[in-house]
Amino acid sequence: MITFSNPWIGVIIPCIIIFTLSTFSAIYILPHHVSNNELTLFICASAMVWISYIIAIIVPPGSPPKNYTPPENGMKMYCLKCKAYKPERTHHSKALGVCVLKMDHHCPWTNNTVGHRNMPHFMRFLVWVDMTVGYLFIRLCIRIMKLWRDKHLPSYLFDKTEVILSIVFLPASFFVLFTVGILTIRVFVNMCNGITQIESWECDRIESLVRRKIVTEERAEFPYDIELFTNIFNAVGSPLTFWLPWGQPRGDGITFEKNESGYTEEGEPLCWPPDHVDYDPENVPLQNLKDGLRRRGEEPDCLLGGIGAGKMQAENDFYKRDHWRNVEGEKLADFGVEHTDI
């Protein structure tokens, strides 16, 4: 995760880029080559970039209610920092110092943690940037090609300011479109699968446990993947309200629908990740790992290692959430999570 000595530097940089590309293009480049209607649409889209960006910065991601009590038959997650129980899919944000509902990641470019409540605002910002900069990039490509075809004409026929800005803005707009586009695709793919970036990392860790035969394949299945459109609507709300600056996600960020892999044959809910063990507020295990699995209606062999000694203990420690890295070298802390929950 990118960090800055002053976190607001991460906000100032995008502001400079957005202002420079949108303002100078609308004044010096586009008026000479597009209709007034197109120019108006570009200005409106640029305004939506600013509006969605400001909202993504100021709207909090959502935190559990102070009086939250976990269900008796559900998983019990306890945050040592907040000294309180928290719902499933909730993590403690190191930057904000609070637990965040359905935390996705901490974004240095908004200086905000992305969670259940502000995910639609964050996604709206990405989409508006992609559309606005994508349009500008296409227009710049057309303009540069025309300048190349007319390169033999006298220089006094060209507006030098426009030519210089077009040449500079072409690679700049491509860079913005490429980097933001990759992030948009990553977030959208996760959204389609009903998963957050943190949970995607968690799935990679669980898959490594399956390969080492520490967790069974049945227990490794992700329980929150319901159906394509349901997953999308749960994350960003209705497609009609998504385009409104105040559009909200579905649900409360506390309880979530699960697929069949999230329940036992008797209909009892299973915890995820499967190697989670319930703890009480005094940070004392309610019981050892195998007893905890039995209490949740699972077979102890789904975690073949358990809490043992020697080599197996070292292996289990390696796969713990605060130690493990994925193939890209990312740890849980790289998503802005302060590992204080047990």
UniProtKB/Swiss-Prot annotation:
Transmembrane segments: 9-29, 39-59, 125-145, 163-183
Places the protein is found: Endoplasmic reticulum membrane
Domain DHHC: start-end pairs: 77-127
Record field: catalytic activity: L-cysteinyl-[protein] + hexadecanoyl-CoA = S-hexadecanoyl-L-cysteinyl-[protein] + CoA
A Pfam family: DHHC
Any one GO molecular function term: protein-cysteine S-palmitoyltransferase activity
GO annotations of cellular component type: endoplasmic reticulum; endoplasmic reticulum membrane; Golgi apparatus
Enzyme class: transferase
GO biological process: protein targeting to membrane
Main function: Mediates the reversible addition of palmitate to target proteins, thereby regulating their membrane association and biological function.
Name this protein carries in UniProt: Palmitoyltransferase PFA4
